[in-house]
Amino acid sequence: MSHSSAPERASGAVITEWRPEDPVFWQQRGQRIASRNLWISVPCLLLAFCVWMLFSAVAVNLPKVGFNFTTEQLFMLTALPSVSGALLRVPYSFMVPLFGGRRWTAFSTGILIVPCVWLGFAVQDTTTPFSTFIIISLLCGFAGANFASSMANISFFFPKQKQGGALGLN
């Protein structure tokens, strides 16, 4: 997405011209598009936050359903999504310019189904090894990385004077 002043070309859903700092453009077209992207991003991040924090709710209940993990192992399962999320934030912040905001938001939100479904199967079998839970926990960290790409995406759409409010809602 460029901040160019070149004439707009019809190219389907791809934005070829974006001038959020131009008040006329912002009123006529920009605000509507920016708001739509913000309101799509907010529920995607809500879902991401739920997946990211999933193990904080699951870990305390694993011993109650028959898993024999130590307290240290349970704390590790709770901490690993934060670790992988922090490490993945750097590459995720570069994905929006590479793939586009809508594509990346859809993809990065969609892949969160993998750790959720896998965890759903894993907790049903008390013989599931701890190493499997480690992998699932690390995959939940992908949800934490979504925040970096979402901030990069939404900041492109809003003029400087409105970015604080938009990013605060996001």
Where do the language-model regions lie?
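Hydrophobic core of transmembrane alpha-helices in multi-pass small-molecule transporters
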Residues: 115, 129-145
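Cytoplasmic loop-to-transmembrane helix junctions
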Residues: 73, 162-169
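Intracellular juxtamembrane helix-capping segments at the cytosolic ends
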Residues: 145-159, 167
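Conserved kink/hinge residues within transmembrane alpha-helices of Major Facilitator Superfamily
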Residues: 52, 56, 88-93, 148
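Central cavity-lining transmembrane alpha-helices of secondary-active solute carriers
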Residues: 76-94
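Extracytoplasmic
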Residues: 36-69
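Cytoplasmic membrane-interface "Motif A"-like loop-to-helix N-cap segments
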Residues: 98-109
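C-terminal ends and interior cores of transmembrane alpha-helices
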Residues: 110-126
